Amino acid sequence: MHHQWLLLAACFWVIFMFMVASKFITLTFKDPDGYSAKQEFVFLTAMPEAEKLRGEKHFSEVMKPTGKMLSESHPDQPPVYLERLELIRNACKEEALRNLSHTEVSKFVLDRIFVCDKHKILFCQTPKVGNTQWKKVLIVLNGAFSSIEEIPENVVHDHEKNGLPRLSSFSKIGIQKRLKTYFKFFIVRDPFERLISAFKDKFVHNPRFEPWYRHEIAPGIIRKYRKNRTETRGIQFEDFVRYLGDPNRRWLDLQFGDHIIHWVTYVKLCAPCEIKYSVIGHHETLEADAPYILKEAGIDHLVSYPTIPPGITMYNRTKVEQYFLGISKRDIRRLYARFEGDFKLFGYQKPDFLLN
């Protein structure tokens, strides 16, 4: 009998210790695609069930636009912008697209989002979609310069000098507060045309002299993906396409580090299914979208978007066809499979003229 009481007491003690320990279990978000081994702590302790449910509701509320960002507050909002947000909401619900449309709100994502506290704006950077000009707008709004024309080009991309903090630099509470209450936007363009722009800018022209693209990344891609190893030409678009469409490219991505942001999907950059953005602009309609974004953010009386050269934002099917000429249908289909989420979330037509 005495032994039974001891056994019963021991069981209660184990259960009690397990309950206490569970309160200190940490939950983490990992960087998407393993771009960084570092983990970001989102919740510091586990919570009782009722409190946990409230916490989950709070976290979902953090991601929802409020106030001026709700469509109900803008009965005169042009339908095209509401349709873009609705398209994203519907695509995010598609189970078949889940692996291509969802990502974690990790440090990698938070590093892409620039903050203007003075005017409560968050801008997610999507390289090769005219981001330099939007950075200039935010730099002026933050007060580092009085006009866009005064900003030296080298300062725009020097994030220690341009006065643009990243969302990742704030505390967990600060991040959640800004995600919940600030005006949030980013810009997209046709995914394949964006890849062409990235290839030209980083591997052909390289105007900002970033030697690592030609001297480190290009040789790595050529060694892995060039069919004719005796060919001595520099990297070709075909090599780039094979690399991007390879499901097993992850080890190369890890080697290349954050330099890959110029061709990472919009989903991985900005987490549009997890963060409820206020406006999604399109590069192809930037002449109308830029003034609209400034107006919705309440800053159109303070700054103007730089002049857009005529025709520069138009989709160029001929250019796309020329770049993909001679590339196998298999490689193009694999590339599309990777970027299908970007095509569908943002309403870009499937490029059947390349795939069939």
Curated annotation (Swiss-Prot):
In myogenic progenitors, it is ubiquitously expressed. It is found in: Golgi apparatus membrane. The keyword Disulfide bond does not apply. It catalyses: 3-O-{beta-D-GlcA-(1->[3)-alpha-D-Xyl-(1->3)-beta-D-GlcA-(1->](n)-4)-beta-D-Xyl-(1->4)-Rib-ol-P-Rib-ol-P-3-beta-D-GalNAc-(1->3)-beta-D-GlcNAc-(1->4)-O-6-P-alpha-D-Man}-L-Thr-[protein] + 3'-phosphoadenylyl sulfate = 3-O-{O-3-S-beta-D-GlcA-(1->[3)-alpha-D-Xyl-(1->3)-beta-D-GlcA-(1->](n)-4)-beta-D-Xyl-(1->4)-Rib-ol-P-Rib-ol-P-3-beta-D-GalNAc-(1->3)-beta-D-GlcNAc-(1->4)-O-6-P-alpha-D-Man}-L-Thr-[protein] + adenosine 3',5'-bisphosphate + H(+); 17beta-estradiol 3-O-(beta-D-glucuronate) + 3'-phosphoadenylyl sulfate = 17beta-estradiol 3-O-(3-sulfo-beta-D-glucuronate) + adenosine 3',5'-bisphosphate + H(+); 17beta-estradiol 3-O-(beta-D-glucuronate) 17-sulfate + 3'-phosphoadenylyl sulfate = 17beta-estradiol 3-O-(3-sulfo-beta-D-glucuronate) 17-sulfate + adenosine 3',5'-bisphosphate + H(+); 17beta-estradiol 17-O-(beta-D-glucuronate) + 3'-phosphoadenylyl sulfate = 17beta-estradiol 17-O-(3-sulfo-beta-D-glucuronate) + adenosine 3',5'-bisphosphate + H(+). The gene is Chst10. It comes from the Eukaryota. GO terms for molecular function: HNK-1 sulfotransferase activity; sulfotransferase activity. GO terms for cellular component: Golgi membrane. Keywords: Carbohydrate metabolism, Glycoprotein, Golgi apparatus, Lipid metabolism, Membrane, Signal-anchor, Steroid metabolism, Transferase, Transmembrane, Transmembrane helix. Its EC number is 2.8.2.-. It is a single-pass type II membrane protein. GO terms for biological process: androgen metabolic process; carbohydrate biosynthetic process; estrogen metabolic process; learning; long-term memory; proteoglycan biosynthetic process. Belongs to the sulfotransferase 2 family. This is Carbohydrate sulfotransferase 10. Disulfide bonds: none annotated. Glycans are attached at N99, N228, N316. The chain crosses the membrane at residues 7-27. 3'-phosphoadenylyl sulfate binds at residues 127-133, 189-197. Pathway: Steroid metabolism; Protein modification; carbohydrate sulfation. Residues 1-6 are cytoplasmic. Catalyzes the transfer of sulfate from 3'-phosphoadenylyl sulfate (PAPS) to position 3 of terminal glucuronic acid of both protein- and lipid-linked oligosaccharides. Participates in biosynthesis of HNK-1 carbohydrate structure 3-O-sulfo-beta-D-GlcA-(1->3)-beta-D-Gal-(1->4)-D-GlcNAc-R, a sulfated glucuronyl-lactosaminyl residue carried by many neural recognition molecules, which is involved in cell interactions during ontogenetic development and in synaptic plasticity in the adult. May be indirectly involved in synapse plasticity of the hippocampus, via its role in HNK-1 biosynthesis. It is an enzyme of class 2 (transferase). Residues 28-356 are lumenal. InterPro entries: Carb_sulfotrans_8-10, Sulfotransferase.
